[in-house]
Amino acid sequence: MKFPSKTVLTVALLALTTVAQAAQRPKVALVLSGGGARGIAHIGVLKVLQDAKVPVDCVVGTSMGAIVGGAMATGMPVNDMEQAVTTADWDHIFGDKPKRKDIPYFRKRDDEKDYFDFTLTLKDFWPVPPRNLVGVHYITQFFRQLTGGLEVEEFDDLPIPYRAIGADLESGKTVIMRHGDLPLVMRASMSVSGVFPPVPYENYLVVDGGIVKNMGIDEGRKLCGDVVIAVNVSSPSTNRQKLESLFAVSEQTINIAVQKDMQAQIATLTPQDVLITPEMGKLSSTDFKEASQFIAAGEKAAKASLKQLQRYALSETDYQAWQQQIQTRKFKHKPISKVEITGSHWVSPQVLKSLLAVKKGEVLDQAQLHDSIDKIYARGDFVRIGYQLLPEAQNSLLRIIPVEKDGRDFARIGLNLHTDFANNSSFGLVAGLRRSWLNQLGAEWQAEGELGETRSLYTELYQPTVLNGEFFVAPWLKIHDEPRDIVSDHETTAQNRVRHTGGGVDIGSVLGKWGEVRLSVSEQRVKWSSSLENVKTVAGESYQQTGYGLKAIFDQLDNPRFPRKGNWAKLDYFHADQGMGSDKDYQHINIDWRRAFTWQNYTLFATGRGGSSLGTTLPYAEQFQLGGALNLSAYRRSELAGNNYFLTRLLAYKQIKDIPPALGGGVYLGLLAETGAVSMEDKWSSRLFESTPYSVGVVLAADTRLGPFYLTIAKGDQDRHTANLTLGVTY
């Protein structure tokens, strides 16, 4: 490609002007301290430096200062940096939990069960303790977004030379990081011990550099600095009156050591240097959501030092030339020639490659790559997934670096409880075990069980048939024994039990993150029994159920328990066919639809579902049921049963209190309105709507790590009143 001679001459003159100007003026080292979220204030300082046309010749950062400094060193525009931190979903980044929209449906299926909100990784069938409190997949992805996926090994080759400061966990020595994978170096500098895992660097295990050198003024002078602009965002000392908690005392103890070294560094500043200390009031080192306030505080403090800063300002022409030099040094991506997977033991590299949105011969689309990596991470096999772009002559090698969990066996446990504060209470203990990657296509075996009022055991072998997992076959076996309450005059007087024992084979297709479709053939023995003497003979009925079915599920709710947006739909059809050996011939279809709408802080969760026997007569064990919490709440559990039914429910709620992320999501207060009906007629008819029971009430609920709690107080037709307290999935 040819360039006009005038363009070449202009660029050359700009470069020569910049070199000459740099030789005449003092070189400026920008030194950014650590301080957790308070370090976002550094961006406000950068905005003022840009407006004042003050160039930066090198940057040194510790902890959060290393993050802002690293982004700056790559040539990232300050406005882009500001937008990135003010729009970031910090709860998601630090929670390290996949967004539900990214989770494949075969993982979402667990949301329909009463498991606690955590998964145990097993090694040799023993739980593996967590290595740290906070995962690092999403925060590392965020750092890669800030640095643009560059291919620079030596930090002197960055548009602005850069150093990050860390501490060696073993020796306590200061580690000056001057080369390597920049996003990992940034993470190493802010890896608070016990919260984030240490990062290997050369022969060190690096953690947050703030504990040894929170402000590297001396390193700034070594790197380039004739003068130093130092920004101190560390937390101020806490007075005695506020040292009342264990956390406050621990934080103060660390802060004493940090401040001691910082004051020694600050004491080396000369009259030619500039020290900027933003005043951030009550904002703390964990207030990442207040990014805009931190940036404003940084701007205010820098403007207060503007007179000192202007000593090093350039003219408009010279500053543009300096910026042009930065842009010409910025990394430019080359086409991808090869993709390789490293560090994978049992997860198939071929499966991972099939899921990556990367095309050979094209320049990397970082946003697209991050999206596909996040979807792979959401499968639940990895602690984190990193990548590197390695330069070649004309192209780049993309290396994917997945870090697998310590085992491929996973366990979940849970609990469900219910009481209507009268004579109906129940509980159940649930547990699940899963072994993943039985073969190179990603086969999984899982077993689930429940002990309590409901007793069940289910096992399935889930075998994908293609690399990307789009199609699968799943043979299964189950025993399921559940109660059916007998209700008279709105009181539960006795209980029947229904047992299904058998198995089947499903073949299906995964609809990406949206859902799945299954076709099944099954054979089960069905039996029901009763606690009432006068119906025991009839209740001893046992019959063979052989047939085929279809299930289709669409699931895009953002939260399965208390959604704010999204849809969920399910179609379930089954035909017990005497031609296949079934003792009875019948059909049933059930359609369930849910949608969440949110206005400001208020959410309306609408549900509509209905079922029909399609003109056949359903056995007692297969009849549709209504009654119980959030299932026509004013009625007792199983009070209404028949061949056809419908239910509509509107649940409007608002979150009234936050729960710490380690304990759950929030507390909700809502209003409930339900109506529905059940008919024993074989065919769906308008008579189903002639007399429709209803229920209205108030719901107090909490989204916790143990599961969703609901306290429902409802009033219905015929002067019905009920209260239900429930732990577990109710709909």
What do these predicted ranges mean?
Residues 367, 372, 384-550, 554-557, ...:
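Gram-negative/organellar outer-membrane beta-barrel architecture
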Residues 12-21:
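Hydrophobic h-region of N-terminal signal peptides that target proteins for export
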Residues 1-9:
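Bacterial N-terminal signal peptides that target proteins for export
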Residues 238-240, 310-327, 524, 566-569, ...:
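Acidic/histidine-enriched alpha-helical segments
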Residues 22-62, 70-390, 405-406:
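Patatin-like phospholipase
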Residues 397, 411-420, 447, 534-536, ...:
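C-terminal outer-membrane beta-barrel translocator/porin domains of Gram-negative envelope proteins
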Residues 166-169, 178, 278, 343-345, ...:
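Flexible glycine-/small-residue-rich
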